[in-house]
Amino acid sequence: PIHQIDDETLENFYSNNNALLLNSLHQNMTDLQQQFFYLWGKQSVGKTHLLRALCNEYIQQQRSAIYVPLNKSQYFSTAVFENLEQQELVCLDDLQAVIGNSEWEIALFDLFNRIKANGKTLLVVSAEQSPTALPVKLPDLASRLKWGESYQLIPLSDEQKLAVLKQNAHQRGIMLSDETANFIFTRLDRDMATLKEALVKLDKASLQAKRNLTIPFVKSILGL
């Protein structure tokens, strides 16, 4: 689960609400001045998308990168952090999943120190709470989390979510009419994770059935 990267890219990350963050990340990808970025916000605001997109960007440039989903930490140990300071990019997603666990907090603290000492790694972490609100037990780790730049990811409006749905469909080569897009958007939960999952399901179904995404077809596939 650690290395798996989906089809997220910086190009299909809807950046209008988070332009300052994107600009700063781009600058540090080419000229590493700020090593640490802390991204926070509630679920489905795009944290995972952005972290995976950053990894994809580095990999396409033949640079070393790793994405670690800490909400899957039951499947691996703190040994996952060993030698990560040798990577050019380290993305740690869902930091709140391991906060409060002393073993993980100590391992995170050690990783921060190694990355800081080495000076060649861009470290980007995400969490649902701000650095000051995260219930960290280890005081030294709490101070490390305030080292770099902190950004709250701003949620998309409904209009922006609908635009992203259409954009994602276009990038997948899916013919999605405005009528069908509006139908999907009004019938499903309006979070991007749900909408993306539905789009992937519809993409596979339409290819297998060789059908266009009409409203009746969407109804049958999504059980609406």
Which sequence ranges carry the predicted segments?
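Conserved nucleotide-sensing/catalytic segment adjacent to the nucleotide-binding pocket
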Residues: 79-125
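Walker A/P-loop nucleotide-binding motif
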Residues: 33-51
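Conserved AAA+ ATPase "sensor/coupling" helix adjacent to the nucleotide-binding pocket
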Residues: 148, 162-175
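Conserved AAA+ ATPase "SRH/arginine-finger" region at the nucleotide-binding site
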Residues: 148-160
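Short regulatory helix/loop adjacent to the ATP-binding pocket of P-loop NTPases
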Residues: 131-146
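AAA+/P-loop NTPase substrate/partner-engagement loops
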Residues: 60-89
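C-terminal helical "lid" of AAA+/P-loop NTPase domains
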Residues: 182-186, 193-207
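Dynamic helix-loop-helix/coil hinge segments at AAA+ ATPase domain boundaries and subdomain interfaces
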Residues: 2-22
